[in-house]
Amino acid sequence: MADAKELTKRFDNTMLFEKEKDMLDAFLELVQDADILSGWNSEGYDIPYTVGRIQKVLSSDDTRRLCFWGEKPRKRVFEKYGREQLSFDLVGRVHLDLLELYRKYTYEERHSFRLDAIGEHELDERKTVYEGSLDNLYKNDFGLFIEYNRQDTALLAKLEKKLKFIELANEIAHQNTVLLQTTMGAVAVTEQAIVNETHRRGMQVPGRKYKKDGEENQPAAGAHVATPQKGIHDWIGSVDINSLYPSVIRALNMGPETIVGQIRPVITSAEINRAKHAKKSFAAAWDSQFGSWEYQAVMNQEKGTGIIVDWEDKTSVRMSAAQLYEIIFDGNNKWMLSANGTIFTYEYEAIIPGLLKRWYEERQEMQRKMRDCGDNEIEREYWDKRQLVKKINLNSLYGAILNPGCRFFDMRIGQSVTLTGRCITKHMASKVNEVVAGHYDHKGESIVYGDTDSVYFSAYKTLQKEIKEGIIPWTKDSVVALYDKIADEVNGSFKSFMTKAFHTPSTRGEVIAAGRELVASKGLFITKKRYAVLYYDKEGKRADVDGKDGKMKAMGLDLKRSDTPVFVQDFLSDLLYMVLQGKDEKEVLEKISEFRSEFKSRPGWEKGSPKRANNMTKYTAAEEKAGRANMPGHVRASMNWNRCREMYGDKYSMPITDGAKVIVCKLKQNPLGYTSIAYPVDEMRIPEWFKELPFDGDAMEATILDQKIDNLIGVLGWDVQSTETTNTFNKLFEF
């Protein structure tokens, strides 16, 4: 004890206790003045562990000291990664798991969410390293044990100081009048914001609708994603619509209280069912459709197509599509028609569009104040946090109201947003092609790709003759100026289009606005949702500075996928950059050959594929019961690791549990009959028994390298196979 006291003196604010009872008692006294308790994975570990120790060492009654008003922590079982876990909710005292906050607000998947990995990524600082088990560290090096625990706490404090996620949650809670814990979701926050706006206007909120027994929630048609013109394209420009879905809601004044009627989707349902019978997916059924079939009939003023309109007063009327067009577009009613066939009124402003408008204006004002702060960093941070809350509110509203659990859920509104958005984006692409190539066509020669709220185009091919003759100047600057003019012309067309397509008054139609986003020297388009461009101008800000050609924007590629090792991600990123710089086939293939040699020289365990081992408990139990159960390959590989740990008597390596991130390695033929084995990403010391396994380097090269190279540049048709180096002599003697 004397040695421990001397060691403790080396550290500030560190208390030494002889008994756990005294330590827990002091902890309970300290937290009395704490508003928020936090930790890293504290929901699943620290909270249940601490409650359990207090119950065991002190008493069950002492757990009340974690709560207010003499209440005990309330037990809660939740499922995570396929396994039930125990936690406790502290009554009156707020607990926020910093790991869950980090996952929620970083919007990116990481190879590891271990505190050590996140500390290194965000702070360039890691946990204290030690050998052996934590129990051995406690017994044999108490000074390092103290340092280890202090560093964990320091990392948490530094992460919050930098990221301010608890502050952000607090700001969201206050602005939307919800509990801090409620901010971990999106639906309840949005719902309460709508309720608050309703009450602010002196109105009442309608009762919650409940689903009838046996009633199933039907999916809504999603955004339109065009099939790209595959391959390399020069001089790419992109135009995108500002906040498409919130703007659509505002433009058509969409709210439960402004719905006048709905065209019964008889034809649409029949067409979707026909597609399903033809083995098409729901998304494929809508692939080339830019509105419900009934909406298209109305816009075509088809006299021979009969439709039924269900009015909100519970009456229905049968008429021709042409008659409804006349009622809405040529009548005196203040009605608008969405691409879903939903009729909205604009006689008064609906709650949800009004709220979106206010949030949008408030965010603009906050951003202005942030810019006006000058060198006042404290004031800048204050306004930055507040504008970020508005951004989160704006981005989450559409998803929340389309969630069946939301009080304001209405499928008619949800599908009106997506289908109307499709029509607007189709018009944008058509108008771009009209300006560039002379004809109004969303699949025209200048259109390279389109996705949800954006269109990618190139005027280079269309204008090549004029460029060669010197009629049209073609430099980086002139292309920026040209593409800005194209975007301006497109933007100026929305007001009249909105009136023509949906009967919106001009004041509402002008809500839809687009701007030129990128100008890129080259782009590689592979398939839907998978493309990359090397841009040198983004919204007027140049990226080709400091000797760089520009910056890459890559979507849906293996460059950032969590199932791709980091060193392979880096290689693929370099490879893509070469392609977008215009390097020829020979140079790119040489780069691949060099990396293959490097890949082959790596240890076998570094060539595996990252995965997440969900439902380990479930599949382990099934295996024990049935002898051999069906399961995903990476789960069996994880199970093989756990078995080998036991077989080799390995007490130091960590087991693979539910939700663990793992690296899956393929194996050659072996006495155990294993085709693969995994190991935990967070395992800092690979055991010797594992290193001696017969790893199948060729098989892993095919999975982790060949397949991903093909995914990236296979569309170019280059001879990548020529870069493969195999030992032909050894192959001859394989049986």
What are these regions (language model features)?
Residues 135-282, 377-431, 449, 458-460, ...:
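Common nucleic-acid-contacting/processivity interface regions adjacent to the catalytic cores
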Residues 8-13, 31-36, 138-144, 175, ...:
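Glycine- and acidic
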Residues 77-91, 105, 213-407, 528-552, ...:
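Catalytic nucleotidyl-transfer cores of nucleotide-processing enzymes
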Residues 455-486:
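Catalytic palm subdomain of template-directed nucleic-acid polymerases
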Residues 35-43, 448:
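Short glycine-rich phosphate-binding loop at a beta-alpha junction
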Residues 483-735:
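C-terminal, non-catalytic extensions of nucleic-acid polymerases
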Residues 127, 425-452:
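Active-site palm subdomain of RNA-directed nucleic acid polymerases
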